[in-house]
């Protein structure tokens, strides 16, 4: 009995390592076999760090940014048809791929139930399917060719990467995928009931092998998105300015500047910088990229409309002063019709702008040359790099005065005037009492005029 158990255990291990799937319930006299097909490796497209950052946005219900070239290519690629079996396997893979991306599944070897039957006539086998207790070489070759035709693994992989790029941030596309199946043949028909697709994980996400992921890593993005959403939810009912201030305070309270990463020459493009801000771990700190991207992420979560009241952009270039001269990333915040500098990094404890001297502050200079901000008796100089100048236009022109949350914006002035006029001709709406004296009269127009003229 023990010998039989060991034999069965060894057979199971061989089957798992081979990457084949379960066989159909064998009919009397049925003979077993297997087929494996492999896709070509993929290159180009978005890198893993871009995909993870996109997944972070997608996990929060936002649309990730897509390059113009990628967006233009999608309609034609979407139109590529999939064979019925390819489409069936594609549909079966999606729920499992999403679980892997969310950190709730470790294995990247996925079994998809199917129901396939190939008769001798369909396969074009002239001899027998089975002889001497084995599938004949002719039948095996015909089955392999038909399976490769029905399950187009290159098309399958292309469609997965095209339609679900961010959920596959963990996948090593440079290796490709393989698909295997077990075959059960009688004298007249061969059946397949399951296809196993193996999707190797990128080295940065692997668990114990290339066909497993470390769920602590793959679950980090979803957890970060949930934490960020809770931060935003906690500011419901606050004014736009109060929300911005709250996000500044949250970020500088959660992380510190990672001087070690700066010394090591860490390049931009690390999506983990954003995740570290929201992971609740005091040992995972960030450089300027983490501060700036986390601030933008909270803003994007808050103001999602096509014409938001507040817009937050990323700017890269150089900075003299603050945490030191060199490459830097910061934010540009558009609020009240003007653009303001927001350097969250240099508002953290121990920096030149702490706690808020470089947040929505006034600057002097120009977008084409440089901007200089004063902070604690020091002058901090910012210069946009060519990339930032190529992406943005008037958004780079910054206000020379700090944002005043008590001042009325042009839109707010127009709204107040509209309410005042409505009050004269109809029922007074909320906000018509501009000066807050409890009544709507000519004094409110005077208050409006004073606000306009300063």
Per-region residue spans from a language model:
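Sec-exported extracytoplasmic/periplasmic mature domains
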Residues: 233, 249-257, 296, 300-304, ...
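Hydrophobic/aromatic-rich core segments of domains that either
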Residues: 290-369
């Amino acid at each position: 009995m023990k010998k039989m158990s060991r034999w069965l255990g060894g057979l199971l291990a061989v089957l798992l390592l081979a990457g084949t799937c379960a066989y159909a319930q064998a009919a009397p006299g049925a003979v077993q076999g297997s087929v494996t097909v492999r896709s070509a490796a993929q290159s180009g497209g978005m890198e893993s760090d871009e995909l993870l950052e996109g997944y972070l946005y997608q996990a929060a219900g936002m649309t990730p940014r897509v390059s113009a070239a990628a967006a233009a290519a999608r309609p034609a690629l979407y139109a590529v048809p999939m064979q019925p079996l390819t489409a069936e396997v594609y549909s079966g893979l999606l729920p499992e791929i999403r679980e892997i991306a969310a950190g709730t599944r470790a294995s990247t070897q996925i079994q998809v139930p199917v129901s396939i039957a190939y008769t001798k006539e369909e396969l074009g086998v002239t001899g027998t399917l089975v002889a001497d207790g084995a599938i004949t070489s002719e039948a095996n070759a015909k089955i392999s060719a038909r399976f490769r035709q029905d399950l187009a693994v290159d098309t399958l992989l292309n469609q997965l990467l095209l339609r679900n790029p961010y959920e596959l941030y963990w996948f090593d596309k440079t290796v490709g995928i393989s698909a295997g199946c077990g075959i059960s043949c009688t004298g007249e028909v061969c059946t397949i009931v399951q296809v196993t697709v193996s999707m190797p994980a990128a080295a940065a996400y692997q668990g114990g092998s290339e066909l497993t992921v470390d769920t602590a890593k793959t679950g980090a993005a979803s957890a970060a998105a949930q934490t960020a959403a809770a931060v935003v939810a906690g500011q419901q009912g606050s004014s736009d300015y109060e929300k911005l201030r709250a996000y500044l305070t949250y970020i500088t309270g959660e992380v510190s500047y990672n001087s070690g990463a700066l010394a090591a020459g860490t390049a931009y493009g690390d999506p983990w910088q954003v995740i570290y801000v929201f992971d609740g771990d005091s040992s995972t700190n960030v450089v300027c990229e983490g501060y700036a991207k986390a601030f933008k992420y909270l803003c994007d979560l808050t103001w999602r409309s096509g014409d938001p009241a507040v817009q937050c952009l990323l700017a890269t270039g150089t900075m003299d002063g603050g945490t030191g001269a060199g490459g830097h990333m910061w934010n540009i915040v558009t609020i009240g019709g003007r653009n303001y500098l927001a350097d969250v990094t240099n508002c953290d404890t121990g920096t030149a702008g702490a706690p808020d001297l470089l947040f929505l502050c006034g600057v002097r200079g120009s977008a084409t040359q440089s901007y200089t901000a004063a902070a604690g008796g020091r002058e901090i100089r910012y210069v946009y790099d060519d990339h930032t100048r190529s992406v943005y236009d008037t958004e780079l022109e910054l206000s020379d005065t700090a944002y005043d949350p008590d001042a009325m914006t042009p839109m707010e002035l127009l709204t107040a005037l509209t309410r005042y006029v409505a009050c004269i001709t109809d029922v007074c709406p909320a906000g018509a009492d501009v000066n807050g004296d409890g009544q709507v009269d000519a004094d409110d127009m005077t208050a409006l005029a004073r606000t306009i003229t300063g």
